[in-house]
Amino acid sequence: MSNVKGESDVSPTESKTTRTDGSFSRGNWEIPETSLPLEMDRSGKARCHHPDMHVAGKSDSLVVPAKQANKAGPQTAAESVEERRLTKENASQPLLVRTQSRVIKSRGLLGVRETARKDKKARFNNLLNHVTTELLQASFFDLKKNAAPGIDGETWSAYAEDFETRIIDLHNRIHRGSYRAKPSKRTWIPKLDGKLRPLGIAALEDKIVQQAVRVVLECIYEEDFLGLSYGFRPGRDCHRALDALYMGISRQKVSWILDADIRGFFDNINHDWLLKFLEHRIADRRLLRLLKKWLRAGVSEDGKWSPSTVGTPQGAVISPLFSNVFLHYVLDLWLVAWRKRDAVGQVIIVRYADDFVLGFREEIDAKRCLGALKERFTKFGLELHPEKTRLIEFGRYAAERRSRRGDTPPETFDFLGFTHICGKTRKGDFTIKRISAIKKLRSKVKELKDELRKRMHMDLATVGSWLRSVYRGWCQYHAIPGNYDRLQQLRTALQELWFRRLRRRGQRGRRLETAEPNPIKMIRQDDKSQQVDPARPGQSL
């Protein structure tokens, strides 16, 4: 096979092939820290006997710091900024492996995970045998019950009426090779900038099989993915990524931020490269054929079918795993190797799905990395968005230097719905303030205004209950230290919308407090979701 990373000289066919029959069970061991040493060839480039795509599962030591997540519960938010040793086995951990979908893995899948952890070059055969009727049933119940139907028009409730018989038939078709993937139903959803984003809705049976296959493949790739990678992974949600970025900038000597955006990432994933990357770990030809069926099933829009030669539908169950695998080889491993080989100063990396932020101490490193990154993406059919990719001066030392020069404060950048601002604590120390992005807030208010208009025919109690749940959901994500003013802005806007709603129902002239119950005011002020520190006054809506 062709050289995938430019530094690797080992093809998938040279790796060991492992057969897994699910005959044993192992405990939940974490990934060891040790990584493979890099050697230098005559040209001065890093070379490794093992491909750097098989680097041992060491978390990114400059990115993922030890800080309790705002929403993470009792678990630690991320690994330490410095070198760290993971607990090899924790007695409090359950024997069964937790997955992104919360589906319990079988004993055989525990063996797959154990083998993937111990041997980074192993290629797995007979993986499709782990797609059992039990796993398909669990995958069916893990799907959203109110999700929109695909091209087949099948809903979850209709399939559930005779799901046992249908699951058995689906299982037989998968293992006979007669299963056929259906095209995705394309719909369009609005983006914050006013443009439309294509969304692919898979047929129900395709969702079930994709969910089951994702559970199987997660056992392998969760042992390969690096600590800098977040998004659509067990225990690595948005708040953990935000905390990792916060601690990385706060504790490291960061003076420059590269806020990068990949143009149309899901629509431009190269199928050939993706399959080559998958073959580094998968030797099961039946499973590879199944993955090809989903990639090349095409899309259906307004009753017209069109082939898909590139990209994966955004919204498909398997697409997040595809994206993480693709960027693991194209971006993550390459960035870590570039940092060790070419960087002069410290570099931090945090990636959430296709959205990533890089922090640099030296400006020369930032400019060199940006140029090398453009070349790297071109090789694999990707492109950085020229208008949304920015290199800005940001961080503790950036703020100090700009203050000495008499310049304006450092620019801000948005990441995962929050605007990051260089600020100071009450004691005068440097800190990073994070507030809800104003575009997100305005978009949410507009969305609720339109939805309230559609619910004019409903009774007030039903609408009030819905509005209260929407506000609670917003607070559960956006209630972080320093974001109190943004939450209050949304609360005030929703109260105004609710007041107008009551007036349209014949309550003209009455005060909101004396009219129908206020669903926003019914939320207690001492709600845990609103226990956040005060921030500087935010922008008005």
Question: Where do the PLM segments sit?
Answer:
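Non-catalytic terminal/accessory segments
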Residues: 1-541
